[in-house]
Amino acid sequence: AVPTTVHCDHLIQAATGAAADLVAAEETNKEVYDFLRSAAMKYGMGFWKPGSGIIHQVVYENYACPGTMMVGTDSHTPNAGGMGTIAIGVGGADAVDVMTNQPFMTKMPKLVGIKLTGKLSGWTSAKDVILRVATMLTVKGGTGKIVEYFGEGARNMSATSKGTITNMGAEIGATTSTFGYDDMMDPYLRATDRGPIADLCKQYAEQLRSDASVEADPGKYYDEVHEIDLNTLEPHIVGPHTPDLGRTVSAMSAEVDEKGYPEKLSAALIGSCTNSSYEDMTRSVSLVRQAKAAGIKAQTSLLVTPGSETIYQTIKRDGILQEFEDAGATVLANACGPCIGQWKRDDMKKGDKNSILTSYNRNFAKRNDGNPETLGFISSPELVVAMAFGGSMKFNPLTDSLKDKDGNDFKFQPPAGEVLPPNGYTPQDAGYEVPTMSGEVVISPTSERLSFLEPFAKQDPAKDYQDLPVLFKAKGKCTTDHISQAGPWLKFRGHLDNISNNMFLGATNAFHPETGSGNNPVTGEENQELNKIARNLRDQGLGWVAFADENVGEGSSREHAAMEPRHMGCRAFVANSYARIFEANLKKQAVLPFTFADKADYDK
């Protein structure tokens, strides 16, 4: 079978800090962790225990390498593309196929080439490259495409910077994003104790990167070609509520006034699988040092998420962790945390309009803290830290000044950091458990969080697809977050029937004014939750259909966004277009994904 690992990164809620939060998670989620560990041990899967890190950072440090291919059940799996891996995010059913030596199939993708010229410097980072790409191509511009970065600017960029870019290829809907092998990957492989692999890559370097003719005439080899000059690229901020609404930091102040965004920055958060490398942390802490020397304190809460136990132990050893804490930052557990909605936020009431700035990858409404009025903006960790000291969405650290302890003007100097730790990564226990190929997998029959999957009832094409009632019509975005919310619902991911109670809770229904609600098309009962209506129809032996507009199922690869509708009686979706993973997941669950022949029919 294909080598497989299990990672526990979604269920640790950020509340008070890493140590206490991890203890609370292990107590609260014990039966889930025990189940995952026992399944991994019995069936030969490597197990990365809770607190070991976010899957993509752990994979980058241990598995990602040039010339390999992998699939992962998370949309940000293409993070590994920064190391020259073809890494594709898939749903669970597709992953099971691969795990059991069945073929993985996807639509033949088109190829997009993005030529990077120049070199990153000053305030501009790899995050600004992908934020610029998202702004250019939009959240559906990469659908059905593989994006390859090439050129001088790609070759002189650090390996971890490359991972930041390919990670957020998920935000443009790309099948995957990747870089060809170059000399910047070699030191990272060796620093992460993979010298033999580094030697092999050097030996086969010519086979692991494009021929010179591709760079000389990219239009001959790619279906689309775009170019970004890193010498002139400005730092970007995207949001709110979508990762493709971008502008330069210099344009942000005017837009705050124009759009009426809350100016005060209510929270600043750095880390996540997108930006938690040693380079990210050292560049960010360089700004903390400048502020400390000037006697300037952060004007908002600052939360720091190390991506893995390796990163955590290394920045702790090097004193970086202490510098963040001395500046008032809260260091969170090595997990997804607020990025996936696992944030016990007490400083803001639901319904209070506020602005937060993160170095994360996704910023849909309600995603981070469950508050629909929280406006989530995304930028580089360097910009997030600097703006935390400014305390305002209008503060531009490239040009604006603050007052130091003596009342004099203080202006941040550009951040500086180390690509790799000078003293190496710490050799501490990273949290990996070798499978024993023994034991039993046990699920309590009374568990509210775990249940064995049962086969769905067989459908009769002659009668089960006739005269289907319409459950709802999505208005605006209909991401996987809208279909199956994360946050507190993540604890039910192992129990299909219970988690189905969140189906469409976040979706806006064109037929009803209240989010997640509608009217029963059969009984006529009004103002009910859509999941309750669906359950009622299913229990009467009736299927139903849902309608949506463009790029339905954008965002997370969570398979529950397809499993829940199937479990609750959905026979088909009809939409103008689909995100790749969601469309594949629907097909795997035998829910038909139809597309309007005429897009205007959606509005009829």
For each predicted feature, which ranges?
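Short internal beta-strands
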Residues: 2-11, 115-117, 148-150, 180-181, ...
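Flexible loop/turn segments at secondary-structure boundaries
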Residues: 13-16, 54-57, 77-79, 120-122, ...
